Amino acid sequence: RPGETERAGIVAALIAFALSGSALAQDLSKLVTKAEVEKVTGAKFKDGWKPMEGQIMFQQEGGDLQISVEVEKRDAGASVRSWEATTKKMQPATKVETVKGIGGDAIYYSTRADLGKLSADFEKPRVQMSVAVAGAKTTAQAKQIVTDLAKVVGPRVGK
């Protein structure tokens, strides 16, 4: 089916990236709430669930939006900029934008109109936070959702 190969590559890259650091012992249910996800998106969501350590996900009730928030320990040389370089090698057309005001350094990137991800580096503790959306109606909506939610979650990282 169209997009399946691209999706498989994205999933493989995300899994490889997630496995690059061990999980952070932070209660993700205190990092982001269903109410905050609903406020940012303007949609109703099912309760969050944790598909793996260091990640919480929310699925829209009766809709396509899916939100993921992850916090992972970051190796000394790893950063959003090294992730940007890897992404550009794998998918040269990917547009990466710097986002100010979240963590020490943050980037937003998307490979399709309905997908968006914001990743931010934090130093104390040395972790990377990622907020992702799938099922957005437009590129602008995807960027708005992950940026607004990252601004809510970011100040709580490591607290």
Language-model segments: which ranges?
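Short, solvent-exposed recognition patches
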Residues: 40, 44-115
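Sec/Tat signal peptide C-region and signal peptidase I cleavage site
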Residues: 19-25
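Cleavable N-terminal signal peptides
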Residues: 12-13, 23
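Short N-terminal segments immediately surrounding and downstream of signal-peptide cleavage
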Residues: 26-43
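N-terminal secretory signal peptides that target proteins for export/translocation
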Residues: 1-7
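A short, solvent-exposed beta-edge/loop patch
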Residues: 26-27, 93-159
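Stable alpha-helical elements in mature extracytoplasmic
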Residues: 33-36, 79, 83, 142-149, ...
